[in-house]
Amino acid sequence: FSDLDAQFAGGAVDIDLMETDLGLSATICAAGLDAQVAYGIPQFRRIPFCGGEMAYALSIVRQLCGHIGRKVAFTIDGEELTVDCLMCAVCNGRTYGGGFYAAPEARPDDGWLDVFIIRRVGRLTIARLLGMYKGGKHFRDGALTEQAKPYFLYRRARRVALRPADGRGPIVATADGECAPCDAVEAVLRPLSGRILLPAPAYERFVAKRSSVDVK
């Protein structure tokens, strides 16, 4: 996106958007541990000489030292379930949070949201799960991998609502980097309601991928 020649040589594409309680989102709306970490970073940045990775690391430490996980009630295209969860992500795009491949096979123009819920686990298991999640190793060929199945739930949907079900107050959520405590969060798909300009290489890949999907 920093190459102006490539930008002008590219093209515009239509993508799906999510309408959420935090505003319109083009990529991922998440709640739980990862959102709590992101929400806490600005507080540490106010400390002198504490910015960037240091603020991120301190926010993680604070979250891990506190109560981990929430009981959350989900309504996913009419399906209702209550889960003790570490965190969850409603995905229109593939990555967020500095390179976490939350939804390795998501497409922003296929008319679906990929929903991943990570069950609450002990502190010793969190690092392993986050490593799997960051590398996108929890999902392959349209399904959860065997190593992910004990810990992850997966759905495809067009409307997702969630609310805390443990009486502990609001849950922290994030959408495209905007964080806030919420009493409830809803994400509703708005098919092909956004348009973005892609630089030439990305535009060519996007069009080729869309063509291959249409052929199938």
State what each model feature region is.
Residues 1-87:
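Catalytic core of DAGKc-family lipid kinases
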Residues 30, 34, 89-104, 178-179:
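Glycine-rich phosphate/pyrophosphate-binding beta-alpha loops
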Residues 45-55, 98-99, 104-127:
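Gly/Ser/Thr-rich active-site loops/lids in small-molecule metabolic enzymes
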Residues 34-37, 82-84, 96-99, 123-127:
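Short acidic/glycine-rich loop or secondary-structure boundary segments that cap or lie
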